[in-house]
Amino acid sequence: LDLMKRSGCLGLFIGFESVQKATQNEVMKIKNLRIDFYEAMRRFHGEGFGILGSFVFGFDYENKDVFEQTLEFIMRSRMDCVELRILTPFPGTRLYERLLSEGRLFVRDWWLRGYPPDTLLFQPKGMTADELISGFSRLNRQTYSFGAMIKRFFGMSPWKRTLFGCQVYAGINLSTRKRYFKGLRNPQPFAGASN
């Protein structure tokens, strides 16, 4: 951490993937299984680093409780910026091949059809498609409400108290908020919803 700080590093992108341990095991985030996320966030913030945490939803071992658990972690850890995504089975990956062999893909050639990011392209295992979509949408609304962003801002790293830090934090959060809320106002049906 000291070397990162001396290098001028202001923040880190951390792919948490999931707050649920079974999912971390599924995606082979073995190192995460031995790390207390709250302690890691406390140390990073204590050293002045901002954190952009990334979470992905739709893994087989997740259930609908993952959304509330993720929100609790985001707010309690006072994560600076958040990226929330729905799992995407890219062609040529083991995930794509497995979902295809299990008959869980809604559309085989989804990438040729222009589906936007965060479109649910497969039948989830640990929850219904509707539960995943509604939980994901609700989590986005809660995470990017002005109240939640302000609450996280005032408990954050010292770098945000600089003009540059404020601009970075506000820019990332407001642009992400705009992207999510634009998508939620004009929702795209998931691949299995039509024809």
In which residue ranges do the predicted regions lie?
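A conserved cytosolic signaling coiled-coil/coupling helix that links sensory/transmembrane modules
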Residues: 92, 167-169
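Intrinsically disordered, low-complexity N-terminal regions enriched in serine/proline/glycine
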Residues: 114, 143, 168, 179-180
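General helical structural elements
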Residues: 89, 165, 181-183
